[in-house]
Design a protein with these regions (language model features):
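Domain-level signature for proteins that mediate thiol-based redox and metal-cofactor handling
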Residues: 1-156
Length: 156
């Protein structure tokens, strides 16, 4: 989407564009809603994005970085996107909309193990199958009511 050159670029307008950058593993949830965008700086005709990885070893960091740069390219300014480790990402950074979208995608949003609910039927009668899911940030659960397996994001 080409950006109107007469429109002033602000951190808010950059953040609005980044709402369209999805997590590669959960296309329904943006990196903004996951709380991964730590900073947006507009200096000397350049845009610098500071990102937080959900886990230090997250294999999707390069994919996310490239997607951020690609999404902001139509603005026509140089863009850098870098991950920082000076502030740790925690699951409480996930926005309410992000939590809703996680649930609608079949993922239980982060909660204490006793508070995990099935994203399909909302039952609290769930059991953890494995603390280790397909990625470091997720665990495997099973719903005793609807009998669906599901993944839950770990509370960090």
């Amino acid at each position: 989407m080409p950006i109107d050159a007469t429109r002033r670029i602000t951190a808010a307008s950059v953040r609005a564009i980044l709402l369209g950058v999805a997590d590669p593993e959960i296309p329904n949830v943006s990196i903004v809603d996951l709380g991964m965008v730590e900073g947006i700086a507009l200096r000397n005709g350049q845009i610098a994005i500071e990102l937080l990885p959900t886990f230090i070893g997250c294999p999707a960091q390069q994919i996310i970085r490239d997607a951020v740069i690609e999404a902001l390219a139509p603005i026509g300014l140089p863009v850098t996107a870098e991950f920082t480790f000076r502030v740790p990402w925690t699951s409480d950074r996930i926005s309410p909309r992000g939590r809703e979208r996680l649930a609608s995608s079949g993922f239980a949003p982060p909660a204490e193990p006793a508070d995990v609910r099935c994203p399909y039927c909302s039952s609290a009668r769930v059991a953890i199958d494995s603390a280790f899911g397909p990625t470091q940030c997720r665990s495997l659960f099973y719903c005793r009511d609807c009998r669906q397996p599901f993944e839950a994001f770990k509370t960090i």
